[in-house]
Amino acid sequence: MALARQVNKRVESREAFFSLEYAPPPSGKDKFKIANPLFIDVTWFERNDPGNLCVPNSSSSIAAICRELLAQPNVMLHLTCNGRTKVETMRYLRQALGKGIRNVLALRGDDVKGVEYTKENSFYATDLVQWARDIPEYKDELSVSVAGHPVGHPNCSSYSEHLQHLKTKVEAGADFVITQFFLEAEVFAQFKDDCRKIGINVPILPGILLFRSAVSLIRIAELSGVSIPSHIRKILEANKGNIAAVRNYALHHAYEMSRELLSKEITHGLHIYTMNQPESSGLLLRRLGLWQTVSVLEHQLLQGPLTKIVCKVIHVPVPKRTKVWDKRADYVAPYLTGKLPNGVRFTKCSHPVHVRFCSCFNGRSAALQRVSA
């Protein structure tokens, strides 16, 4: 099922959910296997050659890793279109689609230094949404989200102008909106109401920021055009230099704001800007009761039919086992040292013994059984 349909289904059923955003290179992403987010979001980091799959920590590489190694089907990749031609942007999009990524956050992106802008490389998020919708073979699979700014976009002349731009992106084919962070729950509530009044009826997910320090919050707020309320500034000033206290406050603030949004049913989904802080994000999700103890990998395996997999054991006579051969796999060492598991013994190469992997899930565990052929 396409991510857009899953989001709509959760909203219609009033079922709480969350998503996680990482900025390459992420840390502790494996810790979120058991959190079961609806989707994982990877930012487009221009300074790290984001579209190059040969760069281990590029945005595209991280998204592919989340998709393949974490068995997370819903991976969203940020994609910008400003400063490059349509052909270049579409190459990155098709590359992501080829890696199984079916979700993108369409963004214009910041101006790139040293780039001379012409009509061939100056585009907006609306253009990218339209390009994505023009790919016929992924029409029913591709989900496209766009960004919304609850206090208005810093490059727009007014708040109402931003709302009109957002409406244009939705009309171009965007499935849902993910907002920039905000610092008061009522700001998001008002933004959502204003969107509904002008006909923006797609789901709107609030962006919840877990800032790392007072300095980082001030910097991000300035870049985003977000005003920091006076009561928050006072708390940050009172704890100046105390990093632990500031992070604890950031967690408390995010919890109180999220709890209010969920309890009043202003939203049913939260988009967590993790700032690559798995511990803080995990604490927030636990306090909100959104942390699930079912692994993503197991959840996906149990959705389909269970299949038995049979493989034949490679038997190598003891005299022929050399150090070179031993290096082929770590599991050989116990057999050479005599430290064998109960019931396991050396056999001749002709012995009709196979190892059958039975996908017999009892709760959350699988069993390995040794049986005669």
Model-assigned labels for residue ranges:
Residues 155-172:
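Active-site glycine-rich loop that binds ribose-phosphate moieties when present
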Residues 4, 31-32, 59-64, 90-94, ...:
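Generic structural signal for well-ordered alpha-helices
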Residues 21, 40, 96, 169, ...:
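Conserved, mostly hydrophobic/aromatic
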Residues 8-13, 32-36, 60-72, 93-101, ...:
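Acidic (Asp/Glu)-rich catalytic clusters
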Residues 21-27, 43-47, 78-84, 109-111, ...:
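Active-site beta-loop-alpha junctions enriched in small/polar residues
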Residues 29, 81-97, 123:
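Glycine-rich anion/phosphate-binding loops
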Residues 24-29, 34-60, 108-120, 174-190, ...:
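Glycine-rich, proline-tolerant flexible connector loops at the mouths of alpha/beta enzymes
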Residues 8-10, 120-155, 197-262, 276-278, ...:
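Active-site pocket-lining/capping segments in soluble small-molecule metabolic enzymes
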